[in-house]
Amino acid sequence: MIPRPSSRLAAALPAFFAALVAAISATSPGEPARASWRDVAPVQATLRAGGIDEASFDVYVARVGEENVQRVREGDLDHLVYYLLQSSRISSAAAIEPAVSARRLVESLDTDRRAAYLRGDRGAAPPVPPEVTARIAALLKAAQAPRGDARLTYFGALLDAAYADPRTRAAGLATEYLRVMRFLYEKEFVAQREASPAAAVAELYRRRGLSTDTAVEAGYVVHLGLGVLKALEPARRVRRVLIVGPGLDLAPRTGLDESAAPESYQPWAVLDSVLSSGLGTPGDLEIVAADINPRVVAHLARAREQPPRLRVASSLHESPSLSLSPEYRDYVDRFGGALSAGTAAPARDLGDGQRGKTVAVSAQAARALRATPLDIVTQRLDGERFDLIIATNILPYFDDPQLALAVANIAAMVTPGGAFLHNEQRPIIGDLAAAMGLPLQQSRHAVIATVTGAKAPLYDSVFLHVRPAAAP
């Protein structure tokens, strides 16, 4: 028999739970909710062009949601493959450059078998090279005793989630290696022979796993976009920011840096830029980081309670043939000024032409961060409104109908007078955003670095859409 509470306690319980619910509601983002066909009325033409109508809409959204869960798994395993090929922590053997491995693997096949393998015929897959098999074994051994290595701990947890039976892990990773190599070969070698290599690569990205990749360079174009926003309206104030897909720096395809723990830079970069530009003020700013990957969300939730010490470093290394633009160098030099309790350390040469610094995030800055799960294609945060929504380097993963849903969900969360900032260059996004009441206000292209002999500099773009203050 369950004991009954005393009458005093019984009387207090409703008030206690009401206060608890109110506190959670005040500090947590709204629950993810799916849009209805009516909610996406302005972009229904794009959906119909993709074969989706009112009768099939709910089934389509559910299917995309399921596919995105699988794409998250594949994206995580992509990073795991890149890690096991390059890590010096798990093996003293020479690191294997993924694209080089892909080329050797595929071009060892005869013409017919190569074509079958690239079509996805598992029966045509080549054997996994011995040096890769050795690295798979080294990873599985190292993951059993990570010894405080945060990146290895992350991948060990991923192995547990992906392969409940440890006996299946070596074979499972071999299969993932072959899948990743097929994608890399198509991207780096097959697509480059097409009439429009960029379009061919873009099509591949709409089918690949959802990557958590993030880098300091992504923060630079957001910083520039916020500068444009401030210049257009100096009195503008930003109190609530939603970052869609902040990501986590785990294991890039090239240049794995194991000198620092995995980190999600974008929330801190956005916080720093909003404060340093004067768009927001400490204590009156909330950053909501929403990601489809639950491991990214968990990482950022911990960061709120345990403010990180960021190793901020450009992924580009200066050399006689590569020069960082003065504006980008200045951004790296100034990064973190609004994040630290004291004065942020100056940037310096970290060796091998890499520029960076260490920034200790203050407890006050960390308290501005919230993390929540969200699939922006199929979901929106119910009842939430934001002064600014940022989505960089995630929109290329979506085809046109998926992009229409993502833009509709973003638009539903932009407050009147609010802004949407992204770096997706497909023209259709301008049409979709305008249809949802977010017309393009300005765009800017920014040079990050110049490369001797290259046809064009390394650059990125930023596009700023603003909803009229009187919502249509």
Model-derived features: positions:
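Bacterial N-terminal signal peptides
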Residues: A12-S25
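Class I S-adenosyl-L-methionine-dependent methyltransferase module
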Residues: D39, V43-A55, V59-A195, G247-R370, ...
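Class I SAM-dependent methyltransferase Rossmann-like catalytic core
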Residues: V180-V238, L256-A260
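Conserved Class I S-adenosyl-L-methionine
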Residues: R311-L316, P320, V332, D431-H465
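A short acidic, Gly/Pro-enriched loop at the edge of an enzyme's catalytic core
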Residues: V377-I389
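A short SAM/SAH-binding and catalytic strip from SAM-dependent methyltransferases
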Residues: D387-P401
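A short glycine-rich, Lys/Arg-flanked "PGG" loop and its adjoining helix->strand segment in the class I
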Residues: A404-P416
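Conserved beta-strand signature within the Rossmann-like core of class I S-adenosyl-L-methionine
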Residues: P416-Q425
